[in-house]
Structures are given as structure tokens and as C-alpha cells.
């Protein structure tokens, strides 16, 4: 995905991919060299590695449901690239990938150019950087409450 094209959609609701465990609908918050930042209802802030994004869909007819009111002072981690993002998340509880057999959770304890090291339940998991599609780390916004 081209960073300059993605920057045109910041603040808009888009869908990442057409289906599958990594597909998400949310508001695009930022776009950098090889990552985008999406605020989703399910997972909060999710950082997607652009090399794994197959498509994105613009919400032109506003048919994609997104019921989160984003505060003006909402803060999230920004990074120039995916490696820099991972460096800022050391010693934090993260989730790698959204679902399926590739989903992992744990404390990010080490990052290098080839692998990340997660600790979870007494195990150290070494995961190849090439298999990381997305990361989230716990920043969430409550859904806007509808009046009944």
C-alpha cells in the first residue's frame, strides 16, 4: 500500500482486506512507511504491516458500521516504520495478528530485524518478523452508548 494514498484516508472509515481473520473495519488514524494505524471497535488501535494488506475499501456510501466517538485528545503510538513501533512496545502486553492459528499474545521482551520474542505463561515464543501481520497493545475506546 502506498503511504501517500493511505494518508488521503486518515480520519475516514475503511475496511482492511475483504475477509478472513485479519480483516477489520475502522477509522484510519495514521500511515507511515510500512504500517498503518486503524482504530477498530473490536480491538482498539491496531497497527497493520502494509506488506500483508491485500486491499482496503473506502466507506463511500457510509455502509460500514463504526460506532466509536473518538476524543479530540486521543493518543496512540506513532512510528516511522514497523520496526520502530515494535521498539516502543518492549515490555508491554501485545497481541500479534488478529485470529486463527497465527494469533499470539504476551509480553514483548525482545525485538531484532528477524524475530520478536514474547513471554506468555512461562514460555518464550520466537516469531519471525515476516509472519507478523498486525499488532495491538491494549489502547481501546468505549463504544458510544446509544440512547434507548
Label the predicted regions.
Residues 1-105, 109-148:
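Short glycine-rich, low-complexity segments
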Amino acid at each position: 500500500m502506498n503511504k501517500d494514498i493511505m494518508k488521503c484516508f486518515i480520519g475516514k472509515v475503511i475496511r482492511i482486506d475483504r475477509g478472513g481473520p485479519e480483516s477489520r473495519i475502522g477509522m484510519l488514524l495514521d500511515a507511515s512507511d510500512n504500517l498503518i494505524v486503524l482504530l477498530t471497535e473490536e480491538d482498539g488501535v491496531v497497527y497493520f504491516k502494509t506488506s500483508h494488506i491485500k486491499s482496503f475499501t473506502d466507506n463511500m456510501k457510509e455502509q460500514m458500521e463504526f460506532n466509536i466517538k473518538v476524543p479530540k485528545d486521543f493518543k496512540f503510538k506513532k512510528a516511522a516504520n514497523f520496526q520502530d513501533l515494535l521498539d516502543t512496545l518492549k515490555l508491554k502486553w501485545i497481541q500479534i495478528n488478529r485470529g486463527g492459528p497465527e494469533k499470539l499474545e504476551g509480553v514483548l521482551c525482545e525485538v531484532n530485524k528477524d524475530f520478536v520474542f514474547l513471554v506468555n505463561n512461562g514460555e518464550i515464543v520466537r516469531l519471525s518478523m515476516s509472519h507478523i501481520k498486525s499488532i495491538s497493545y491494549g489502547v481501546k475506546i468505549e463504544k458510544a452508548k446509544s440512547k434507548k
